[in-house]
Amino acid sequence: MKVLLHQIALALTIASAAFLFAVGGLLVFNQMRGKVGGLVTSKERMNLIEQLHKRPKDEALKQQIRQLDLQLRQHTFSQLRLSANGARAMLGALVVLLASAHFVRVMHRAAPNPVAWGARKPEENRVAFYAVAAVFGLAAAAALLLAVRPVQLPKRAPVVAEVSETPMSLDDWQQNWPAFRGQWGGGTTKTSVKLNLLWKVAVPLPGMSSPVVWGNKVFMSGADEKEERVFCFDAGNGQLLWSQPVKLSAASQLPEQLNEDTGLAAPTPVTDGRRVYAIFANGDVAAFDFTGKQVWARNLGALENAYGYSSSLALWQDRLLIQLDLGEERDAKSKVLALDTRTGRDVWQTPRPTGGSWASPVIVMVGGKPQLITCGDPWLLAYDPVSGAELWRVNGLGSDLAPSPILAGELVVALKVNSDVLAVRPTGTGDVTETHVAWKTTDGAPDVPSPVYDGKRLFLLGGGGLLQMCDPATGKEKWAQDLAEDFYSSLALAGNTLIAISRKGQIFAIEAGDAYKLIAKHLLGEACNTSPVFHGNRMYIRGKDNLFCFGE
């Protein structure tokens, strides 16, 4: 038995040494080719880019650059995979070699050996010694080479005349419901809807995110501690078209605490008509095309917040905009981040002097230019969504922010929870606290639901059910009505009708007028913490378990 074990160990030693020799040589050859792929230094690519400078509208040339770039990237990642896999294989072989060689040495005295070491010819002993030394020397050299000069991608060079997609048109954007509370975050549609239930369908996973709609598709997100998914339903009949999991190479870390009021899928997705984008409380953000194919996914790190993460995504052209307000202001963790919608790569990020918040950012148009409006503690801040540059700020908000800001005529209205309502002229630069605050009321403000503006009136709904109509020019209350329910869902406006949905699932249809007038009520039959969505003459509502469609 000892003889057999000795022979097996000896065979393993020889085989692992030969394997180390072969793989080490392959890695040395791979490294001698220089930095991987010529991704940036390719003369052919550089020449094509020079030509593109001269002919920026040459589509055939752009396509040629795109194809060459793909080939270079494939070659680059092929070399990277070879180096990484080879290094791992060498490490495994080295462990086997050392273990088996040690076993041979220990067994040597006991194992029957017709020719002892001292009985060998001196020439044979020298050959054996130098062979073993060569194997270990080559393995050490290869390991040292990889440690000192690892295979790396070249640093990212500035993109010159990058081929881009056709920009999304504002007409398409405005004809759909692509983001939280609609096109411009105001929760309004010009079309009226009827509280006539057309259908309801089960939603596969829980979530507090609201639906978004583009064309004939309704998108939502859902998650539990085991998986996170994006769903696509037929807007006409509610059929589930696809349900796709977010796939990453490594599991993402869950937040230390999960709040029941937010969970893992509280942020509402956003869509640009090509892809739908979703973010989850563990920091996973992903893009899917309209067929359900995952285009890209990445992790931003666990989004730790006292009440969970709930800021919905915003979008402008090819920028996916994410408000990350985390921890306390002193932690310096908060920022606004823009990702390339095509690739998920960072485009810009701007630090924020704020602590944790739960409000969602909104895009508004001011003087024909877009502004990204955000609420934080204590700042109401506006950014250029293209560059990330801060445009203006007002000190006037507070902690535990959940309501999102809106544009009411020419004023941005934001809420300081349970305290102030603030209206700001969004035309200044820098800190405009002393110059651009149009009015402020201090009689209390809603804690969770966001407000709505009908062109003449400003409506506020508190979490405890107090509905107020205010003068948007002064903030003065005109009338108030207690709906005697609790609310998380934001107010919405369909035509001339206010829609308010209580946490118990009671829908209130109220006339948007100079006096309170209840038009109709409808009970969903299940809890609801999401906001209503409109498309055409239909309204979509996500309940605790089902997606509902109302209309005609």
Indicate residue ranges for each PLM-predicted region.
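Cytosolic-side transmembrane helix boundary signature
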Residues: M1-I8, L97-V132
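Hydrophobic membrane-insertion alpha-helices, especially the h-region
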Residues: A11-L27, A133-L144
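Selective detector of the "anchor" transmembrane alpha-helix that sits immediately C-terminal
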Residues: S16-A22, S83-R109, P211
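Alpha-helical transmembrane signal-anchor/signal-peptide segments
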Residues: N30-L48, V151-V163
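Low-complexity, acidic polar-rich segments
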Residues: T41-L80
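Juxtamembrane/start-of-transmembrane alpha-helix segments at the extracytoplasmic/lumenal side
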Residues: T76-L91, N125-F129
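Internal/C-terminal transmembrane anchor helices
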Residues: K121-Q152
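Noncatalytic, solvent-exposed loop/strand surfaces
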Residues: A147-E552
